């Protein structure tokens, strides 16, 4: 690992703590109350504030116009901000789920186009936020596994027409849908065999035939809207097709089903460690709240912090934070050596990207990204050259981190409420909000049950020839 990454990560943590002090902590409970009073509230002011801080370009690689901070540092940032408010962190973090979807496709031309719009939005003060749409009314976790998607009730269909596709269907629970400028959308040519006909698109908000329904009245992370996206005879031209069997065949002979799974794995292997970091941030926030309460509250003339049962619970909570942090660090380490951003962290490449001035990327590198050869090369590097064991390592560790970190976060919130008693149930104490926020983390990015099965599939089953996964 390049040594400068450590310095860079410390810088990111310092920025996150400053943001917490100035924005997240003062607003967390206020915005939560506001969303209960006004269920149609959309966080435009928060999005604009995050844009002013540069958060929507911070982890976009410099070749695409972004600031180019190392990707693992985002997990540290996520932990910090989520310790104050997981919903606010999702307003920032879900944008990078779509960024991962763009880059993992290997479609350099389209990734450059969209990501440079994000950069332009930062400069102009008009945020260009991205969303990613996979979940459907009858298919959620199913769509993240090729072995399961054919069993789901898939309805979002892409029909081939001259010069593009017509999209019909609905996506649900799409984080930041209502406030996004572009959506990375996955649809299927044959809804009976979706695993072999996956197509990725980018759709601009306002496109004819694309509209928003309601956004969910959620239990937690209320400041981050979860939207219904409706597509009714929505035409998407060929130049906005991100991923398809036709594009895949240009750089690999592997079956489309396998390539689609590898594409999905690249995305979630990069983002699930971040969800773990969200969970550990909430776990840490709950620990800090319980510690403060125990240090300042007397029972029968004796500080709560001096009672052994409280000391044991606080030690357990602290242990949970440490273990979760190790889990997302290990998952990020796997990605750094074998996953989506491995090339960016090879020492010569990393220092080259740091040393080159902005104009070099704008004048020299940016035009190269429009070449078809560049997209073919990226496709080859992502989909044809990596070994299956690399994919299993990254995907397996990402799943372990995801379910470990989020489960530990739930435990810490429950323990904090036990320590704080009735005080922990009060809205102004903040811990009941943390418990509402953390529950969602066990569900999105693949339920924790699915992630346990994926961890078994990737890390255990290869050593047991008779083991079968997703066979029921």
Locate predicted features:
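Glycine-rich cofactor-pocket loops
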Residues: 3-4, 30-41, 252-274, 287-320, ...
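Amphipathic, small/basic residue-rich leader segments at the start of a protein or domain
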Residues: 1-93, 113, 117, 340-347, ...
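A short core secondary-structure module
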Residues: 168-212
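A structural signal for short hydrophobic beta-strand segments in well-ordered beta-sheet cores
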Residues: 156-159
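A short, Trp-centered hydrophobic/proline-enriched beta-strand micro-motif
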Residues: 125-140
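Glycine-rich phosphate/cofactor-binding loops in nucleotide/flavin-utilizing enzymes
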Residues: 383-389, 412, 418-472
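N-terminal glycine-rich flavin-associated loop
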Residues: 90-116, 140-143
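Glycine-rich beta->alpha junctions and the first turn(s) of the following alpha-helix
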Residues: 3-7, 11-12, 212-325, 441, ...
């Amino acid at each position: 690992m390049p040594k400068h990454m450590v310095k860079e990560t410390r810088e990111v943590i310092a920025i996150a703590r400053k943001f917490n002090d100035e924005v997240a902590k003062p607003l967390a409970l206020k915005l939560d109350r506001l969303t209960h009073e006004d269920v149609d509230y959309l966080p435009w002011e928060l999005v604009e504030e995050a844009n002013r801080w540069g958060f929507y370009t911070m982890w976009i690689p410099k070749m695409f116009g972004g600031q180019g901070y190392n990707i693992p540092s985002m997990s540290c940032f996520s932990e910090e901000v989520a310790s104050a408010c997981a919903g606010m962190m999702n307003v920032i973090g879900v944008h990078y789920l779509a960024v991962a979807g763009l880059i993992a496709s290997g479609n350099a031309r389209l990734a450059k186009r969209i990501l440079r719009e994000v950069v332009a939005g930062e400069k102009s003060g008009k945020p260009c936020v991205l969303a990613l749409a996979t979940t459907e009314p009858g298919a959620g976790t199913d769509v993240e596994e090729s072995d399961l998607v054919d069993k789901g009730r898939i309805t979002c269909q892409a029909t081939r027409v001259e010069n593009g596709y017509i999209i019909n269907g609905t996506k649900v629970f799409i984080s930041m849908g209502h406030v996004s400028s572009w959506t990375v959308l996955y649809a299927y040519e044959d809804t009976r065999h979706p695993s072999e006909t996956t197509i990725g698109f980018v759709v601009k908000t306002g496109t004819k035939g694309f509209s928003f329904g309601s956004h969910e009245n959620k239990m937690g992370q209320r400041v981050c809207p979860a939207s219904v996206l409706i597509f009714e005879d929505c035409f998407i031209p060929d130049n906005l097709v991100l991923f398809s069997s036709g594009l895949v065949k240009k750089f690999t002979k592997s079956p489309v089903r396998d390539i689609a799974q590898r594409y999905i794995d690249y995305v979630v292997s990069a983002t699930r460690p971040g969800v773990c970091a969200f969970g550990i941030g909430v776990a840490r926030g709950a620990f800090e709240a319980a510690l403060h309460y125990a240090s300042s509250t007397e029972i029968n003339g004796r500080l709560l912090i001096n009672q052994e049962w409280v000391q044991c619970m606080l030690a357990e909570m602290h242990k949970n934070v440490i273990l979760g942090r190790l889990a997302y660090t290990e998952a990020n380490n796997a990605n750094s050596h074998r996953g989506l951003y491995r090339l960016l962290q090879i020492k010569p490449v990393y220092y080259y990207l740091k040393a080159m001035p902005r104009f070099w990327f704008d004048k020299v590198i940016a035009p190269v990204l429009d070449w078809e050869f560049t997209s073919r090369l990226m496709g080859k590097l992502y989909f044809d050259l990596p070994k299956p064991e690399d994919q299993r390592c990254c995907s397996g560790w990402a799943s372990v981190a995801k379910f470990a970190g989020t489960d530990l976060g739930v435990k810490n919130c429950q323990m904090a409420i036990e320590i704080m008693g009735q005080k922990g149930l009060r809205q102004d104490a903040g811990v009941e909000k943390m418990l509402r926020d953390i529950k969602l983390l066990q569900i999105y990015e693949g339920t924790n049950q699915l992630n346990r099965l994926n961890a078994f599939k990737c890390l255990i089953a290869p050593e047991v020839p008779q083991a079968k996964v997703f066979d029921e």
